[in-house]
Amino acid sequence: MAKIYGDEDASLEPLEDKTVAVIGYGSQGEAQAKNLRDSGIDVIIGVREGGPSWERAKKDGFEVLPIPEAAEAGDVVHILIPDEVQPQVYREHIHDNLEKGNALGFSHAYNIHYGLIEPPEYVDVILVAPKGPGHMVRKLYTEGFGTPALVAVHQDYTGEAMDLALAMAKAMGFTRAGVIKTTFREEVETDLFGEQVDLVGGVLYMILYAFETLVEAGYQPEVAYFETLHELKLIVDLIYEKGLSGMLDNVSNTAEYGGLTRGKRIINKEEMRKVLEEIRSGEFAREWTLENESGRIVMKRLREEIENHEIEKVGERLRKMMGFED
């Protein structure tokens, strides 16, 4: 049974008299920094000097510093820049500015788990990972609630790393919704698996192949779009609010029977296991590193295929018709 922490299980005391240096001011960086500040935590922002994030953070009222200076000034250095740039930024701007007893914070365990960032032994290394995008992290906090999150400790130099992770989670509103104790390995492997198998990869290609199957069989693309893409939101909203059984309770008997008897035929669990093994073995991480070093050639080609697909052209027309796009 998972260990779940609520608001009453955490204290802000571990953050008293400490400065949190948030490295990066993108979607998560902005949201987490604002939540921390609104909870009374001393927050500074570390970004590339003169860039758009620098100006935006200053406009939002933060003290903004170049990354090396922010890392030196922070007691907690919370790294919220994209995974693929973290190792170089860490090596060049953060590592040498860490002091004994500092803490390194992450919202994704990727670079620590795969050994792309190797922190010194004299710092705590914690994970505070909200299970939602930055705009939702901020919105729910301002509404008096919060986003569920995961917390973990990779390295506990001070003996107080978990208390610090929970304090960070509380300050950002996550303990209001519930925070699950995990490990760096579990967070990254399940996160990548979810992205690749269903949330991004699985859903994307299920939609494309379903659309193509109908169009190739002679059905109108516009009708195929509604049946394979547009109506998906209705089902996902039901699952999100009521669970799988609740969704089945709210569709027709015909839809339920057809889905239950045919759905398994289009899903290949053996391929899912292969994807999971690629993640667990580090094969995917090595592939992604090489992809970035080569200028993301494969990713750009695949992205172009999606952008030029008929479903996108049909969808653009229909979304305009429905008033979703200008």
UniProtKB/Swiss-Prot annotation:
It catalyses: (2R)-2,3-dihydroxy-3-methylbutanoate + NADP(+) = (2S)-2-acetolactate + NADPH + H(+); (2R,3R)-2,3-dihydroxy-3-methylpentanoate + NADP(+) = (S)-2-ethyl-2-hydroxy-3-oxobutanoate + NADPH + H(+). Residues 2-182 form the KARI N-terminal Rossmann domain. Pathway: Amino-acid biosynthesis; L-isoleucine biosynthesis; L-isoleucine from 2-oxobutanoate: step 2/4; Amino-acid biosynthesis; L-valine biosynthesis; L-valine from pyruvate: step 2/4. NADP(+) binds at Y25, G26, S27, Q28, R48, S53, D83, E84, V85, Q86, G134. Residues 183-325 form the KARI C-terminal knotted domain. Binds 2 magnesium ions per subunit. SUPFAM superfamilies: 6-phosphogluconate dehydrogenase C-terminal domain-like (SSF48179), NAD(P)-binding Rossmann-fold domains (SSF51735). Its EC number is 1.1.1.86. One of its GO terms (molecular function) is magnesium ion binding. InterPro entries: 6-PGluconate_DH-like_C_sf (IPR008927), KARI (IPR013023), KARI_C (IPR000506), KARI_N (IPR013116), KARI_prok (IPR014359), NAD(P)-bd_dom_sf (IPR036291). The active site is at H108. Its cofactor is Mg(2+). Keywords: Amino-acid biosynthesis, Branched-chain amino acid biosynthesis, Magnesium, Metal-binding, NADP, Oxidoreductase. Belongs to the ketol-acid reductoisomerase family. Involved in the biosynthesis of branched-chain amino acids (BCAA). Catalyzes an alkyl-migration followed by a ketol-acid reduction of (S)-2-acetolactate (S2AL) to yield (R)-2,3-dihydroxy-isovalerate. In the isomerase reaction, S2AL is rearranged via a Mg-dependent methyl migration to produce 3-hydroxy-3-methyl-2-ketobutyrate (HMKB). In the reductase reaction, this 2-ketoacid undergoes a metal-dependent reduction by NADPH to yield (R)-2,3-dihydroxy-isovalerate. This is Ketol-acid reductoisomerase (NADP(+)). The gene is ilvC.
